[in-house]
Amino acid sequence: AMGVKESNIHIEDNRAHDGELSKEKAREIILKYLEEYPDAKVKTVTPFKASGIHEDHRALGEAALELYREGKIKDLRFYVEPYDYKDFKKVNPNVEVWKVLPSQEEKLLSAMNAYKKWNPESGHYAIGYHSVKSHFDELATNKTQYVHAP
């Protein structure tokens, strides 16, 4: 649905359960993939505070930022979830954030639909959509994304 070849989809055996991802574990997992893809362009959720950021997602951002500062990640961008943007700017006024309007709206909608896919027989449980349905619905109507550099 997202246009990614099946051979490029990786399910991490060492993944954490919801609410249990630490920066250290995230770092370990990111490093594993950087060994395989050393020039990867890394995109993840911002490591900086805002009221609605899921702690597991923030751990990924913290680990990626640390690896960037060590020179292990060369190209890094952080996303600020649209529902957190106002609070993010209030708490992080000096972080320059720019809007990204998807030039390929169809890809964005396909990616969102992957999170909505319900097919338990094939391991698709629509977990992302079920946990934050209102956020997906909002993104479907307001397709603006917010991004910042390290």
Put a short name on every predicted segment:
Residues 2-7, 24-25, 71-150:
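The feature marks non-catalytic terminal segments
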